[in-house]
């Protein structure tokens, strides 16, 4: 169970030794005040997955604690030791809708008309309150706008990178606003995968897990079903000199112009439709960049020709390189990685481009006030110029992603014609991406339009990353690692495909079979199947797993997401059963010491059950002793030893303990302790001594005679 530990000097649990930390871990409450010393504070920070607020010594922690008190209770997401994000927002108390999403910046004035008159939209990029405006503004716009896609495509608002003003009455605006605010602030009293509370928890812990996973793996990976949320991680991973085989699914479907035009005329506009043009350029930029990494490795320089206005540049402050942009229309970009040249890029500039650089070209001449004849002439001149620049750059071993136009008759495409999915405008554009000089292929106008129309139904991940579907025939090198985060568990994948991936080194996520009740009270199953009931979560259906059965069959380490984050500096304090489970098969740092995934909280399930029914701790000792003798005086003589309470916890509560430790790792460590006379561990938490083989045998006798479990790890531990 993730805990919030508030370190102070005035009140709380005295935590002076590593044994005190073990005792603290078994306390049942989530929020604990603690009085620590430097040593125990360091252990809590580094060797637990708890969220730590040192309100005595850390100014940022004091600020966070004040915010937490105003929002209590709420989820907390820690991106490092001191930068945090809370799971709700109190800016609404001042009638402010707080957002951080940069693509809204050019739309704020018109978006404000979708809110009640006495409400404001404010941007706070680095607030520790959750930016609910990033979600709320989608909802109010989608429910109040009256335009169709086709009307928006031909509107002035589209040209101005904004949205149409709201034409609804204030009564209707207030009605929609009340609906969404009621949803966002609905108190969570049970597991509800459709709630905003759940959505925030899953979104943010997923981001933390992605960061942690990509910091662990090196070399070559097979990445199954990456979403666009992984884009930053993927670019940083490739920029570090690693490589990726992508596995995605192409969802393109054949269509025709009349059908797609009818769709645009009948379909109501959404915010996703509004944003697609900005996202198109960003996705095209990164599609070409990924191609460069795969071909040449790290680019010497990165260029963007035809950059205005590109509001998406504010979304990518994280890129590990500068982007040199060219456009005579200047815009100040709130991103210090952007170096803007407010001039045209012409043929003379080609010589200044370094070899093995990456260039994205999206030159667009303003033709809005021209007649059709002039437009066609300019389109052709522009396309010829872009092709000339691109091919000359490609001759310098540069990767060039560049805009093209579809013309009547035959068209020359340099490589495959590329069409971004889900575009609103049935225009005449496509893209080429080349890494060297290539001979053009001839496409008829009708062929290109057919490809454009079918691409509308494809998914963005397949377009940007490429790759093929992962299945049981996929070949994985044994020196590679399979990464499947929130993807392989989807029921579109067969169990045979999933088991194929599990065979290799991997990090794979699954939902836990249990999502209601208390994590400390998960009953053992009567079957041995690792895969259990299918789970509906948000818009997806996934295979869920039973951690104990899974670990027994596949021999993998199994922990919850919150526990997994202990491998780095990020932390997540969320409802326990919102956690997904992470399956790990790979070499891990410091596997045997207590540095990572130690047995903190191992007593929580037994204490929870004992306290729930007021059962004396003595009952457990007597019950075990009666397995071998009715002489209970032996208990005192042996100081209540002779059995392993920890092993009982592992065997009876394995599927619970994944929420606080790695029970599988405990078994491997216990097995090793049987062959080592004494193991020194400077990271040790808890004063307990290693058990003997006899004590483990006694414990298994007790479990068997009392029929406490259906299956055990006896052969793993003692075989």
From Swiss-Prot:
Membrane-crossing ranges are: none
Q: Which processes are annotated in GO (biological process)? A: viral process
Q: Which reaction does it catalyse?
A: a 5'-end diphospho-ribonucleoside in mRNA + GTP + H(+) = a 5'-end (5'-triphosphoguanosine)-ribonucleoside in mRNA + diphosphate; a 5'-end (5'-triphosphoguanosine)-ribonucleoside in mRNA + S-adenosyl-L-methionine = a 5'-end (N(7)-methyl 5'-triphosphoguanosine)-ribonucleoside in mRNA + S-adenosyl-L-homocysteine
- Spell out the subcellular localization from the entry: Virion
The keyword Kinase appears for this protein? no
Q: Which UniProt keywords apply?
A: GTP-binding, Methyltransferase, mRNA capping, mRNA processing, Multifunctional enzyme, Nucleotide-binding, Nucleotidyltransferase, RNA-binding, S-adenosyl-L-methionine, Transferase, Virion
Look up the EC number in the record and give it.
2.7.7.50, 2.1.1.56
Q: A single Gene Ontology molecular function, please?
A: mRNA 5'-cap (guanine-N7-)-methyltransferase activity
Q: Which domain of life is it from?
A: Viruses
In its keyword annotation, does this UniProt entry include Nucleotide-binding? yes
What's a single GO CC term here? viral nucleocapsid
**Family under the similarity heading:** Belongs to the rotavirus VP3 family.
Q: How the protein assembles, per its UniProt entry?
A: Interacts with VP1. Interacts with VP2.
Purpose: Multifunctional enzyme involved in mRNA capping. Catalyzes the formation of the 5' cap structure on the viral plus-strand transcripts. Specifically binds to GTP and displays guanylyltransferase and methyltransferase activities. Together with VP1 polymerase, forms an enzyme complex positioned near the channels situated at each of the five-fold vertices of the core. Following infection, the outermost layer of the virus is lost, leaving a double-layered particle (DLP) made up of the core and VP6 shell.
What is the protein's given name?
Protein VP3
Query: What is the species of this protein?
Result: Rotavirus X (isolate RVX/Human/Bangladesh/NADRV-B219/2002/GXP[X])
């Amino acid at each position: 169970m993730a805990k919030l530990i508030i370190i102070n000097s005035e009140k709380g649990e005295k935590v002076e030794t590593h044994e005190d930390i073990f005792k603290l871990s078994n306390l049942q409450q989530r929020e604990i005040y603690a009085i620590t010393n430097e040593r125990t504070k360091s252990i809590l920070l580094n060797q637990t997955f708890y969220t730590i607020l040192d309100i005595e010594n850390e100014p940022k922690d004091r600020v966070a604690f004040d915010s937490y008190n105003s929002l209590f209770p709420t989820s907390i997401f820690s991106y490092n030791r001191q930068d945090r994000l809370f799971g709700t927002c109190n800016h609404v108390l001042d009638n402010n809708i707080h957002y951080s999403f940069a693509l809204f910046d050019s739309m704020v004035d018109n978006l404000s008309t979708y809110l009640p008159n006495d409400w404001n939209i404010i941007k706070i990029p680095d607030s520790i309150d959750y930016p609910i405006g990033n979600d709320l503004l989608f909802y109010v716009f989608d429910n109040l706008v009256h335009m169709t896609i086709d009307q928006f495509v031909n509107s002035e608002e589209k040209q101005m990178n904004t949205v149409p003003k709201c034409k609804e009455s204030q009564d209707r605006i207030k009605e929609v606003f009340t609906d969404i605010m009621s949803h966002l602030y609905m108190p969570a009293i049970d597991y509800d995968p459709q709630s905003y509370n759940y959505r925030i928890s899953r979104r943010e812990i997923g981001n933390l897990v992605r960061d942690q996973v990509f910091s662990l793996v090196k070399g070559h990976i097979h990445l199954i079903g990456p979403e666009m949320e992984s884009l930053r991680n993927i670019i940083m991973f490739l920029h570090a000199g690693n490589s990726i085989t992508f596995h995605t699914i192409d969802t393109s479907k054949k269509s025709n112009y009349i059908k797609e035009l009818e769709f645009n005329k009948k379909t109501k506009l959404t915010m996703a439709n509004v944003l697609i043009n900005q996202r198109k350029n960003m996705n095209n930029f990164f599609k070409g960049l990924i191609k460069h990494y795969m071909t040449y490795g790290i680019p010497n320089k990165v260029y963007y020709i035809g950059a205005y206005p590109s509001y998406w540049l504010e979304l990518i402050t994280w890129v590990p390189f500068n982007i040199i942009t060219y456009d005579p229309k200047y815009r100040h970009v709130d991103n210090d990685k952007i170096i803007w040249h407010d001039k045209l890029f012409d043929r003379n500039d080609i010589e200044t481009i370094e070899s093995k650089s990456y260039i994205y070209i999206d030159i667009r001449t303003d033709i809005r006030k021209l007649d059709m004849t002039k437009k066609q002439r300019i389109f052709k001149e522009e396309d010829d110029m872009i092709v000339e620049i691109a091919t000359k750059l490609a001759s310098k071993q540069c990767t060039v992603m560049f805009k093209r136009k579809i013309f009547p008759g035959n068209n020359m495409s340099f490589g495959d014609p590329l069409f971004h999915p889900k575009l609103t405008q049935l225009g005449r554009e496509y893209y080429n991406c080349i890494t060297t000089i290539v001979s053009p292929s001839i496409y008829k106008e009708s062929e290109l339009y057919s490809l454009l129309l079918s691409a509308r139904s494809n998914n963005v991940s397949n377009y940007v990353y490429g790759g093929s579907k992962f299945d049981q025939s996929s070949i994985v090198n044994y020196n590679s690692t399979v990464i499947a985060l929130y993807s392989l568990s989807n029921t579109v994948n067969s169990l045979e495909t999933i088991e194929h991936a599990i065979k290799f080194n991997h990090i794979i996520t699954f939902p836990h079979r249990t999502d209601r009740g208390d994590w400390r009270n998960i009953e053992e199953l009567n079957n041995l199947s690792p895969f259990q009931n299918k789970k509906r979560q948000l818009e997806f259906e996934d295979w869920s797993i039973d951690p104990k059965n899974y670990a027994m069959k596949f021999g993998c380490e199994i922990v919850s997401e919150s526990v997994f984050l202990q491998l780095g500096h990020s932390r997540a304090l969320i409802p326990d059963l919102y956690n997904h489970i992470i399956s790990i098969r790979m070499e891990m740092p410091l596997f045997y010491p207590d540095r990572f995934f130690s047995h903190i909280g191992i007593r929580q399930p037994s204490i929870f059950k004992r306290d729930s029914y007021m059962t004396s701790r003595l009952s457990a000792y007597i019950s075990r002793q009666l397995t071998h003798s009715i002489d209970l005086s032996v208990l005192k003589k042996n100081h209540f030893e002779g059995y392993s309470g920890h092993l009982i916890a592992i065997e009876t509560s394995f599927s619970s303990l994944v929420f606080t430790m790695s029970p599988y790792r405990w078994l491997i460590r216990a097995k090793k302790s049987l062959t080592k006379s004494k193991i020194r561990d400077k990271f040790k938490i808890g004063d307990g001594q290693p058990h003997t083989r006899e004590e483990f045998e006694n414990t298994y006798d007790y479990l068997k005679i009392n029929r406490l479990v259906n299956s055990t790890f006896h052969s793993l531990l003692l075989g």
